[in-house]
Amino acid sequence: LIMSGFDTLLSIAVATNGQLVEASGVTEATARKIIHAARDSMNMGFSTGTDMMEKRENVHRISTGSKNFDTLLGGGFETGVITECFGQYGSSKTQIAHSLAVQCIKQYPESRVVFIDTENTFRPERIAQFAKGAGLEPEQVLAQIKVGRAFNSDHQMLLAEKIVDIVKEGDNVKLVIVDSLTAHFRAEFVGRG
């Protein structure tokens, strides 16, 4: 299981029987028992509202660099969740991503940002401009951003899986940006769904 990427209780607890059977060759019944044991040990049931409030108190926010935008978002982009920015072509989604990458590094100086670029929109010169505007050294900020250019949906999925390896290698990844999450899937799976 470990060699197949199931190296935490959580990864086992949220797996399907079929995934464990395929990864390890165990029977369906054994996979079910392993998953149930992982779920039992993690206490993956309900929580009280008080428990949820305590968890919410530990949520941090990454500033956008704009006080007005931060106010609209309740203080910035929440950590620990997936946030999607969507809009028409040219509506500044990529600019938000670039600014957020710089602001993350400003807020967490030892952090790293992972940027999966599916439309060839990552612009290091724009990052440098945002860094200068934030009072940071552009070269240092650029060194803290890992960029992967995804050429199709399979490559995009591979890059997403490699983020786990980056974290395991000790990089303090605080932000993952995928620009654009759906572009390759829309192009490759036309008419499905």
Report each predicted region and the residues it spans:
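The Walker A/P-loop phosphate-binding site
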Residues: I2, Q19, A23-S24, I34-Q140, ...
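Conserved inter-motif catalytic segment of the P-loop NTP-binding fold
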Residues: Y108-G193
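Extended, structured, electrostatic nucleic-acid-contact surfaces
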Residues: L10-E22
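Small-residue hinge/turn detector
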Residues: L1, I12-A13, T27
